Amino acid sequence: MQGFKLAIDGPAGAGKSTVCQKLSQKLGWEHIDTGAMFRALTLYLLENKIQIQNEQFLNKALTKVEIVYLDNKIFLNQEDVSLKIKNYIVEKDVSVIASLPAVRKKLLTLQKGICKKIPYLIMDGRDIGTVVIPDADLKIFLTANITQRALRKQEELKKKGTQMEIHDIIEQLKKRDYQDYHRKLSPLQRSSEALLLDTTKLSIDEVVMQIQDLINKKTSPCLK
């Protein structure tokens, strides 16, 4: 087998990043969290107070941005921003930033370049199976009901020392979902080839096991 590309898409809080990290550790494959790339770019635009409504200013700013994914860490202009990109302000604005054509074009070019260089790759995001790796060997769409997704987000925030009421998180997720599903460029959608996996009642390990089984079914004929 020459390589394997696994594309995992789904809404915020479905468990994509955690599942992909565990899969990466188990399989020894590279994992690229494209959401982290969008958050890193959002962080840059916020910190530098770039007027995103001004296309000329935005395009000029994007030429100064270098994003590198290395050892499950995200570097923005050579600075490790893996923790900084997880703050509430970035999370709140990333969906708006991600809808900008110039931003998507820059990161799509970077993501496609990564796909060509890494033979065994797990990539997760919103449009991986539909746009970034349309020829992926296996496509999965992870989802969960909004209450479960909100509870996961709340737990994630607690670990970062942030308290947030569950109803506020649910409202935030609803807004994020609407933006992701309705943006004009590369909206969140399930590829016709993607297998739907509802994680509402599943543990992370159970999801990982199911995906491993799917990978084994795909690869076993190649190994005979």
Curated annotation (Swiss-Prot):
A GO biological-process term: nucleobase-containing small molecule interconversion
Domain of life: Bacteria
Reactions it catalyzes: CMP + ATP = CDP + ADP; dCMP + ATP = dCDP + ADP
Molecular function via GO: ATP binding; CMP kinase activity; dCMP kinase activity
GO cellular component: cytosol
Record keywords: ATP-binding, Cytoplasm, Kinase, Nucleotide-binding, Transferase
Keyword ATP-binding assigned: yes
Subcellular location: Cytoplasm
Broad enzyme group: transferase
EC assignment: 2.7.4.25
Binding positions for ATP per the UniProt entry: G10, P11, A12, G13, A14, G15, K16, S17, T18
Similarity field: Belongs to the cytidylate kinase family. Type 1 subfamily.
Designated name of the protein: Cytidylate kinase
Originating organism: Phytoplasma australiense
